Regions:
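Signature of uroporphyrinogen-III synthase
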Residues: 1-216
Length: 216
């Protein structure tokens, strides 16, 4: 829309669990903290009748697309999801199931358990760092044609930093603006010398794009 050419360059490869063996008879709601969690669930299970409590709008959109009809979005981060559960569910009455990846930035289950909820967890996918930078991304960085880089998680930021170092391209980032979805994601970029590192005020794509508009 602003004349920029977007390039998608995944830093992580998502691997779904071969089997998802969890019982749902006592579960009142499913908790999703990424679209990958929704996709992983649907890769091994077909149940979409339970309420889906989602960390943000992108995850909620993925749940709706997957066939969930009772979807609530916290519109933010892990703390917002915890607050949403507290507002809509009752400890001791509602048992929850957090469907998550192998690596977590926040212990949502532990936080909800501390508030009196019964919470089960199931690891249903893993995001694995790639072995090298995607060719298009490496080319843009090497030719100093990259203007802005968006980072949607801390693990993606850490993986990018390592891969850039492996490719001996770290000194090519000093003209690039990095935009991170959260401070945690920004913390994964500290080893690189960027033109600037911007952090979204709220953890969503629209705010990240707004930060780009501020600079361009």
């Amino acid at each position: 829309r602003r004349g920029a050419e977007p390039v998608i360059a995944p830093m992580l490869r998502v691997e779904f669990a071969d089997e998802i063996e969890v019982g749902l008879s006592r579960i009142s709601a499913l908790l999703f903290t990424s679209p990958n969690g929704v996709r992983a669930w649907l890769s091994g299970r077909s149940e979409t009748d339970l309420p889906a409590f989602c960390v943000g709008d992108a995850t909620a959109a993925a749940a709706l697309e997957a066939g969930f009809s009772k979807v609530r979005s916290a519109g933010g981060d892990a703390n917002d999801l915890i607050a949403l559960c507290e507002a809509r569910l009752v400890p001791g009455r509602h048992r929850l199931l957090h469907l998550r990846g192998a690596h977590i930035a926040h212990d949502i289950a532990g936080a909800l358990q501390a508030r009196g909820f019964e919470v089960d967890e199931a690891v249903i996918y893993e995001a694995v760092a790639k072995d090298q930078l995607p060719k298009k991304a490496a080319q843009l960085i090497r030719q100093r044609e990259l203007a802005v880089a968006l980072f949607h998680s801390q693990r993606a930021a850490v993986a990018f930093t390592a891969l850039v170092e492996d490719a001996d391209l770290s000194d090519h980032l000093n003209t690039v603006i990095a935009v991170a979805i959260s401070q945690a994601a920004a913390n994964g970029l500290v080893r690189s010398d960027w033109a600037a590192v911007k952090v979204a005020e709220t953890p969503n794509e629209n705010d990240m794009l707004g930060r780009i508009g501020f600079d361009l």
